[in-house]
Regions:
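Short linear regulatory motifs enriched in tryptophan with gly/pro/ser
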Residues: 1-210
Length: 210
């Protein structure tokens, strides 16, 4: 997938440069791969401009994969933490030994090719992501973030009958019998906790419905 996307990107860049040479300025572009930190079946390939802020990436991840109740979030890049909202009490979260900053920081100032960093959404029922900077290039891109590829929904079967799972119980998700088809879900004891099976590493958590 990575090799294919690099080849396609090179072709598009060449075509864009030829047709838009006088209209669009060159900008730095990072190629990011984002995965569920403990659920690698869920992944995204993105192109993102280096003049974008961490907040832009935060908003994108919330929109495509995560947002349910307006929870807080954070990027962890090397020894620094970038929070969607800073706390007055610096002993919260990672403790006073970790430097905390706002997300109004440009990617070009904190990322470099080969770097791996992390993201967390919701500090209660936390969804964790790992991010890798595959490459950096100069090119033309009008939008700040471009989705290049994402995973197909992983096959998940009903734990009762083996059919395709449609629902997951947020109460039972770390136990047996959480993944259910619609028919088997009718007899589940926690029917009020059932959530739709969606293509996201946040599936089955908090109130996330996709």
């Amino acid at each position: 997938m990575t090799r294919h996307l690099k080849a396609c990107t090179a072709k598009k860049d060449s075509a864009a440069t030829a047709s838009n040479k006088r209209r669009t300025r060159q900008t730095g572009i990072f190629h990011l791969v984002i995965e569920g930190r403990f659920q690698s079946a869920y992944w995204l390939h993105l192109n993102i401009r280096s003049d974008s802020m961490l907040r832009d990436l935060d908003h994108f991840l919330r929109a495509i994969w995560l947002e349910c109740c307006g929870h807080m979030s954070a990027f962890r890049i090397e020894e620094k933490t970038y929070l969607s909202q800073l706390f007055q009490d610096t002993s919260f979260g990672w403790g006073p030994e970790r430097q905390e900053y706002k997300m109004d920081t440009k990617l070009g100032k904190v990322l470099r090719p080969g770097m791996k960093f992390f993201y967390e959404y919701d500090f209660g029922t936390t969804t964790e992501l790992s991010l890798r900077v595959l490459s950096y290039r100069e090119g033309q891109m009008e939008e700040r973030i471009r989705l290049m590829a994402r995973n197909e929904p992983p096959p998940i079967v009903c734990e009762k009958c083996g059919a395709k799972a449609d629902l997951v119980c947020a109460e039972c998700i770390w136990a047996k019998g959480a993944w259910l088809c619609k028919r088997c879900a009718k007899n589940h004891e926690h029917d009020e906790m059932l959530l739709p099976v969606v293509n996201s590493p946040r599936v089955g958590q908090c109130g996330y419905t996709g």
